[in-house]
Amino acid sequence: MRTFNFLSFPQVHRQALVKAVLVAIATVSLLLTSDVINPQSAQAYPFWAQQTAPETPREATGRIVCANCHLAQKPAEIEIPHSVLPDSVFEAVVKIPYDPASQQVLGDGSKGGLNVGAVLMLPDGFKIAPPDRIPEEMQEKLGGVYFQSYKEGQDNVVIVGPLPGDQYKEIVFPVLAPDPSQNKGIHFGKYAVHLGANRGRGQVYPTGEPSNNNAFKASTAGTISQISKTEAGGYEVTITSEAGPVVENIPAGPELIVSEGQAIEVGQFLTSNPNVGGFGQKDTEVVLQNPGRIKGLVLFLGGIMLCQILLVIKKKQVETVQAAEMNF
C-alpha cells in the first residue's frame, strides 16, 4: 500500500492545497458562528407579510398587506420633515399609540403585553443611514432597534418588529436622503411616504385560518347541547341542529358568552372578541430640496429687502428736499 506523502507534491501544488483547506475551514466556521454573532431576530415578524407578498408590502389598491391579518383599525402616525437636503440624515418618527393597560391573548391563551411593528416605505434612493452617518443624539433615540429590508436589494422599504410596545410606542427611523448629483436616477421633487404599523397579534393567519386572538361564530343554527373544556384550555361546543350535531372547536383565549341549552343562529358569536390591537396606515410626503433653489430664494428675498430699504431711503430724501423747498 502506498502512503500519502504531502511533501512529495511540488511546492506550488502544496501552497494551493493549503490555501484551499484554509478557505474551506474559514467558510465552515463563518456558517456555524454567523447565527451567534449576528442573530436574525427580526425574522419572526414580518415573516408572514414577506411570504404572502414578497415583492412589495403595498397592494395596487394602496393598502398595506398587514391589514389582511390585522383586521381591527387603529391609528398610526408618522412625523418627518417637510423637506430635506441631499445626502442628509433626518428622523422619521413613527408613533403607535395604544392603552398601556391593555393585555392581549397570547398563543397559549394566557394574557401578556402587546408587541408593535411597522413597515416604512420610503421613496427610491432613501434608506436607513449607516451607523457612521447617524449623529450621537439620534443614536440615543434608536434604542437598539434592528432595521430590516423588506426585500434584498430594496433598501427603501424597511421593517421593524416585533418590539415590546411598552418601550417602543415611538420608533425613530434614521433616514439618509439620496444625492441626485451622485445618482442620476434620483431627481429633486416631492415624494410619497407610506407607513403601516400594528400593535398586538393578528386575527387571521395567511392560510386563512383564524388565530385565537379572534371572536368565534357558530357555523350552524341549533341548540347548544354540550360544552366541554379541552386539555389545551379551549372548548368544544356541540350544537345540535336539524342535520345533526356539529362540534365547534374554540382555542384557548377567547371567553365563551353562550351556555348549554341556548338556541343560536348561524353566525352568532360564541365568544367575546379578545383583540385589543390593530393595524393603522398613514401616507405623507417629503420634498427632496435642491440646495441651489434655496440659495436662489435667499438671494431673491435679500434683493427684495434691499430694494425696499433703498426705496425708503429715497423717499426720506425726497421728503427732506420737499420740506426744504417749502421753508425757502
Swiss-Prot record:
Where found in the cell?
Answer: Cellular thylakoid membrane
Q: Where does heme bind?
A: 45, 66, 69-70
Q: Does the keyword Signal apply?
A: yes
Presence of keyword Electron transport? yes
Which PANTHER family would you find in this protein's record?
CYTOCHROME F, PTHR33288
Q: Which organism is it from?
A: Microcystis aeruginosa (strain NIES-843 / IAM M-2473)
Q: Which GO molecular function terms does the record list?
A: electron transfer activity; heme binding; iron ion binding
Give the matching Pfam families: Apocytochr_F_C, Apocytochr_F_N
Listed as disulfide-bonded, the cysteine pairs are none
Q: Which family does it belong to?
A: Belongs to the cytochrome f family.
SUPFAM superfamilies with a match to the protein in the record? Cytochrome f subunit of the cytochrome b6f complex, transmembrane anchor, Cytochrome f, large domain, Rudiment single hybrid motif
Which keywords describe this protein according to UniProt? Answer: Electron transport, Heme, Iron, Membrane, Metal-binding, Photosynthesis, Signal, Thylakoid, Transmembrane, Transmembrane helix, Transport
Spell out the Gene3D superfamilies in the cross-references: 2.40.50.100, Cytochrome f large domain, Single helix bin
Highest taxon of source: Bacteria
What cofactors does this protein use? heme
Described purpose of this protein according to its UniProt entry: Component of the cytochrome b6-f complex, which mediates electron transfer between photosystem II (PSII) and photosystem I (PSI), cyclic electron flow around PSI, and state transitions.
Q: How does it assemble?
A: The 4 large subunits of the cytochrome b6-f complex are cytochrome b6, subunit IV (17 kDa polypeptide, PetD), cytochrome f and the Rieske protein, while the 4 small subunits are PetG, PetL, PetM and PetN. The complex functions as a dimer.
Q: Which gene encodes it?
A: petA
In the bilayer, the protein is annotated as:
Single-pass membrane protein
Q: Which residues cross the membrane?
A: 294-314
Q: What's the protein name?
A: Cytochrome f
> How cofactor binds (record note)?
Binds 1 heme group covalently.
Signal peptide start and end residues:
1-44
GO BP of this protein: photosynthesis
Gene Ontology terms, cellular component aspect?
plasma membrane-derived thylakoid membrane
The family database entries (PROSITE patterns) matched by this protein are listed as: CYTF
